[in-house]
């Protein structure tokens, strides 16, 4: 009995759905992001959309040092701290774009600790990119532009199994990041 085009399409769709479900289950089982600061920060960023007028960007020095509530009390602003671990200049750029897409920003502060500028791009430190993009909105163009800049097609392949992000490095997988 010949299979119709509709049956073949249904089989392909079922395969894609089962593969996606399997990858989602593996992600759930292998990646513990319950305590991920970046996940919480980005959830709060999206929940606060339209209200932010002052933004703080930078590495851990920023997110551990700036208290938006104290800034708001002193300046009468509605500030947000979008700092994250290992945030490099390109990460700050994409966080600025992500925030500016939904907010009318008046002031942006960029923390510039010197060791953060030993590497200017996340292509040399993939985890710096993944800490942000893993939790950015799935419909955000900034997420995909940042991933493309960091690792090209290889970075998109890594979206399928985030458990790999802990081992992703240019030295460990040289052909992948060229």
Labelled PLM ranges:
Residues 57, 61-146:
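Membrane-embedded segments
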Residues 28-51:
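Alpha-helical transmembrane signal-anchor/signal-peptide segments
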Residues 7-27:
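Hydrophobic membrane-insertion alpha-helices, especially the h-region
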Residues 125-178:
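Secreted/periplasmic serine-hydrolase-like ester/acetyl group-modifying domain
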């Amino acid at each position: 009995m010949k299979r119709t085009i509709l049956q073949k399409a249904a089989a392909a769709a079922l395969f894609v759905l089962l593969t996606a479900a399997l990858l989602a289950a593996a992600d759930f089982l292998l990646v513990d992001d319950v305590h991920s600061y970046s996940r919480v920060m980005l959830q709060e960023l999206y929940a606060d959309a339209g209200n932010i007028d002052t933004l703080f960007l930078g590495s851990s020095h920023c997110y551990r040092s700036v208290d938006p509530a104290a800034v708001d009390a002193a300046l009468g602003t509605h500030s947000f701290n979008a700092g994250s671990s290992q945030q490099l200049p390109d990460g700050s750029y994409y966080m600025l774009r992500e925030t500016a897409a939904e907010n009318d920003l008046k002031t942006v502060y960029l923390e510039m600790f010197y060791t953060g500028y030993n590497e200017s791009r996340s292509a040399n430190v993939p985890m710096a990119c993944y800490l942000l993009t893993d939790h950015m909105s799935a419909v955000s163009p900034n997420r995909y532009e940042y991933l493309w800049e960091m690792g090209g097609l290889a970075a998109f392949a890594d979206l399928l199994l985030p458990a790999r992000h802990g081992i992703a490095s240019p030295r460990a997988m040289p052909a992948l990041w060229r």
